[in-house]
Amino acid sequence: MDDNYFMKLALQEAHKAFDKGEVPVGVVVVTNKRVIARAHNLTEVLNDVTAHAEMQAITAAADMLGGKYLNECTLYVTVEPCPMCAGALRWAQLSRLVYGTPDPKRGYSNISPFLLHPKTEVTSGVMADDCSDLMQLFFKQLRG
């Protein structure tokens, strides 16, 4: 089980979002090579601008662990987190972030690369083409 394996699981979640008409972002949270949370965007379904996949996954993982910190966890997400989600990941003290495709317009790294916890290790570009292709397909269909 490597980064590609877990990113494929995150992509499965992104496809669930796509099927619901949500921006197709998916997440899995892993500790000790075990998935403890899965989530996808639910902003439209819940009518909640904060219901990003990362936020849903942070809550689910914390519930599973019985505590608010994810300092022994890796979060796999198909698209670079926005500043809101990066800030939440900082507060959760996430150990490692792995994302697929960058988000030049809304990603945290272009707005404030220091939003994540100083100890959070970041890996980007895992299955980037697959992640990017799904986003492009979604917005192409949305715009007709």
Where do the model's predicted regions map?
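Short beta->alpha transition motifs characteristic of CBS
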Residues: 36-43, 119-121
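Short beta-strand scaffold segments in enzyme catalytic cores
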Residues: 25-33
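Short, basic and Ser/Thr-rich N-terminal targeting/leader segments
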Residues: 21-25, 71
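Helix-adjacent hinge/juxtasegments
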Residues: 47-80, 84
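Residues that line or immediately flank small-molecule/substrate-binding pockets and catalytic motifs
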Residues: 43, 77, 101
